[in-house]
């Protein structure tokens, strides 16, 4: 059994079912101890020709054998089968439900963690929590409860029977048990540490494999298959060594328990045989005593298994606890209100921001205003802080008080859900789900019709590509959309955002993978369909944003200039230099192609 703040509540929640299983277990354990008494009757009947039943001496006949031994044995077996089926359903069924509840709780907590958490913790490690560690918790909860109570009840009942038959023999038999308990306690601590190391090693191996499968195209392009194989072999070898070490300890524990069992058998046969020789035991009583000891062999063996499972369960619970204890950095403050009837006005006031654990501010004294319905471009060199602005607007990170306003209201006074719901977002990494194209486009709108989906695809200029696929909109995309080209992936992502028709549309470098003619079509469609709605377009190419209402030019985390393209070109030397360089690059490429 394992205990912890995230597991204890389930013992109470499933208490009725566990108590029913415990009652069935107690019944099975009690009637199981009637079997050694039947052994005694058979042995004494064969040796003495008579048996004592309920204080009455009866001749050992076929009728007595059938009525007082065979029929009771049949009933005992039937009741044991029914009881064991019942407690298995109760204990193991509860364990499955506990794992399901805990998995849901983990997922619910995970979705509320900030983006920073996922930048620090690798996907492979997180996935191992939902697979290996949860499986261990499930096994430990079901088997652990069973083994604990079975070892306790059957062991105590059998020891009581043994004690009433001969105190001295029972005390001698308990000496190895005390030694085993002391050894097992120390080994449990070692096994907990080793299991944690095992799970960490498996997480590293899983994460490495996941990254390689995701980046297989890059690996092949750079002909690094053998190098990655060697790295995998190294991690796999480390994982193997840790597993072998753990297996050695578990095997040693099992051997020690077996040694203990055999030691007790020697004591019973030696001293018990002496008691028979002295006439204090008859042969039937010795067999009965051995039968009681055989009944507690399973609890004794269960002790080693319980120690191992508890060690594993405790280690896995510690890892899961780290996830559930991870603080929710970005959360609503008490008393926040919803952003109702959003218009799309955005204002930054002297905002300074650095990423958690960052060494310097990526945004410095940022101030600008976007009126509702404006189309605004945000440009700047790589690392200028363009994406950081989007992260703050979407409340991916905490925003300093009084520095960011939506429709004139501080975002910290608004619920995160309502602010995000007022936005449609196309990120740099155009993530698509392993689902149909239709479901990907309709991801943000639950009641989208096929006509709505097709209209959004047309505005993103991806409709013709989709209908060319064999299954059209029902085409199932591979993981992260690998079955479509980069440009198609971007346009499907744009269609998804356009379908939401949010007051604020944010496109973060979202047309970089399409040609200039396709880009022009998309931008024209945006202009026509987004009239009166705010659009933010982050781009590297000036041609993407030069026709927008105004452009915000960022340079080294500061707002260098704000205004229409012509105004910035005339008044801002840095902006003009960037425009001229891009035009020169375009002319050079055009000359080469010619």
Task: Locate the predicted segments by residue.
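Membrane-integrated ABC transporters
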Residues: 1-35, 47-72, 86-91, 95, ...
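An intracellular "coupling" helix at the cytosolic face of ABC transporter transmembrane type-1 domains
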Residues: 12-13, 115-116, 132-141, 145, ...
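Transmembrane helices of ABC transporter permease
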Residues: 13, 17-30, 143-197, 268-281
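Residue-level recognition of transmembrane alpha-helices
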Residues: 21-22, 70-73, 77, 151, ...
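Juxtamembrane helix-loop junctions of ABC transporter transmembrane domains
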Residues: 23-24, 31-47, 75-123, 127, ...
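Conserved catalytic Walker-motif region of ABC-type ATPase nucleotide-binding domains
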Residues: 110, 232, 320, 348-350
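Helix-loop-helix
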Residues: 161-175, 245, 249-318, 324
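ABC-type nucleotide-binding domain
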Residues: 332, 339-594
């Amino acid at each position: 059994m394992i205990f912890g703040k995230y597991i204890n509540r389930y013992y109470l929640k499933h208490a009725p079912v566990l108590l029913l299983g415990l009652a069935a277990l107690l019944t099975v354990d009690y009637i199981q101890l009637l079997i050694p008494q039947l052994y005694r009757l058979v042995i004494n009947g064969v040796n003495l020709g008579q048996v004592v039943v309920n204080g009455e001496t009866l001749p050992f006949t076929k009728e007595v054998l059938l009525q007082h031994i065979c029929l009771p044995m049949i009933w005992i077996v039937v009741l044991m089968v029914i009881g064991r089926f019942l407690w298995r359903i109760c204990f193991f069924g509860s364990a499955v439900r506990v794992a399901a509840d805990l998995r849901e709780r983990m997922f619910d907590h995970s979705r509320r963690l900030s983006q920073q958490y996922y930048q620090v913790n690798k996907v492979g490690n997180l996935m191992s929590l939902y697979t290996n560690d949860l499986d261990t918790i499930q096994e430990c909860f079901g088997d652990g409860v069973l083994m604990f109570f079975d070892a306790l009840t059957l062991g105590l009942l059998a020891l009581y029977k043994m004690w009433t038959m001969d105190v001295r023999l029972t005390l001698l038999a308990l000496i190895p048990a005390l030694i085993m308990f002391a050894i097992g306690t120390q080994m449990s601590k070692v096994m907990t540490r080793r299991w944690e190391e095992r799970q960490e090693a498996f997480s590293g191996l899983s994460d490495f494999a996941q990254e390689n499968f995701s980046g297989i195209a890059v690996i092949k392009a750079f002909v690094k298959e053998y190098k990655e194989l060697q790295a995998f072999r190294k991690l796999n070898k480390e994982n193997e060594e840790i597993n072998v070490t753990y297996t050695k300890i578990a095997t040693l524990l099992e051997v020690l328990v077996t040694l203990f069992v055999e030691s007790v058998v020697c004591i019973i046969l030696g001293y018990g045989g002496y008691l028979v020789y002295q006439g204090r035991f008859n042969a039937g009583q010795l067999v009965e005593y051995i039968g009681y000891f055989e009944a507690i062999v399973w609890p004794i063996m269960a002790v080693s298994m319980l120690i191992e499972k508890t060690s594993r369960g405790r280690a896995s619970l510690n890892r899961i606890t780290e996830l559930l204890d991870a603080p929710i950095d970005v959360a609503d403050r008490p008393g926040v209100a919803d952003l109702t009837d959003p218009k799309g006005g955005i204002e930054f006031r002297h905002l300074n921001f650095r990423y958690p654990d960052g060494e310097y501010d990526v945004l410095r004294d940022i101030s600008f205003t976007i009126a509702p319905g404006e189309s605004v471009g945000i440009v700047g060199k790589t690392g200028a802080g363009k994406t950081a602005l989007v992260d703050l607007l979407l409340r991916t990170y905490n925003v300093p008080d009084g520095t960011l306003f939506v429709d004139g209201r501080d975002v910290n006074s608004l619920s995160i859900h309502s602010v995000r719901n007022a936005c449609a977002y196309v990120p740099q990494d155009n993530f698509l789900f392993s689902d149909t194209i239709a479901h990907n486009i309709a991801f943000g709108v639950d009641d989208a019709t096929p006509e709505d989906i097709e209209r959004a695809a047309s505005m993103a200029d991806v409709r013709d590509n989709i209908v060319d696929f064999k299954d059209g909109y029902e085409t199932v995309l591979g993981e992260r959309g690998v079955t479509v080209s980069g440009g198609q992936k971007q346009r499907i992502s744009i269609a998804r955002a356009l379908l939401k028709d949010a007051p604020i549309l944010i496109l973060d470098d979202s047309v970089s993978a399409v040609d200039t003619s396709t880009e022009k079509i998309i931008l024209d469609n945006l202009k026509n369909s987004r009239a009166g709605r705010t659009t933010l377009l982050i781009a590297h190419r000036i041609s993407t944003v030069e026709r927008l209402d105004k452009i915000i030019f960022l340079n080294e985390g500061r707002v260098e200039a704000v205004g229409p393209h012509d105004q910035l070109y005339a008044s801002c030397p840095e902006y003009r230099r960037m425009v001229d360089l891009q035009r020169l690059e375009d002319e050079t490429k055009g000359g080469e192609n010619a």
